[in-house]
Amino acid sequence: MGNGIYKVIDKFHIAGNVDILITEGTNVDNNTKSILPEYVLKKEFKEVFRQYKNTFIICSSTDADRLESIYSANKESVRRPFIVDTYQKDILCLIDKYAENEKLLYHFNIDDICSYSPSVEKMDNMMRCHGFVMLLRCSEKFQSYLEKILPWCKPEETCLVYSQYHGYIDKREGNTAFNQKLYDFVEQFRERGCFVKEDLHTFGHASKQDLVRLCEQVNPKVIIPIHKDEKADFASILSDELRARVCEYEYSMDGVDISLDSL
């Protein structure tokens, strides 16, 4: 969470005028792992690209900063073919088009980005010869792509980088964020003997300090924390005054009863 959000709060006089603040709580109970900035992740992506000829990456399709880190890490190191699907390429085109004031931050060259087509044998041949960096999503479409690509990828030359919230693939008991389909999607790489790297995702989630500052500055009537472990105590990080405003299950406002489920 950058300092820009606080400038927006001041500019539009948001503080004290918000009924409900919905905020994440990913790092509420994170007392051990540090939050890595994107430039550190970028360096680690470079090391992965240098070590493995074929790199698959699962990440958010709309996280512009993460996409920039991955794209630039490849461009500044091994310069392998950068492979996406048409949806992801459209997202990158939108970022490139509308981030006119952020040209120093985003450096996507759309002409260098390849949209994968399983029917184009020339693309598969290029990927076999030069290796690749390919962005994935957990879907039937991408599963069909993998069934075509993985058989000719040597396991010792192939890596999957999981760059999303780890809770989605953490199979521990009581983890309500666990996603079986995503877990199976990731595990197929291990079953083939490929290396799976899961620790390149910490930025993009606000620290406890930022969450406290945000709640204090916005000063809403109700605070609803989402995207957190079930046992994480969001209210415990706030002052007594704000703690009383945290609603995780149900609340009433202006005669309306609202129940919160699976947030």
Locations of regions flagged by a protein language model:
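His/Asp/Glu-rich metal-coordinating catalytic cores
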Residues: 1-65, 69-76, 81-83, 99-102
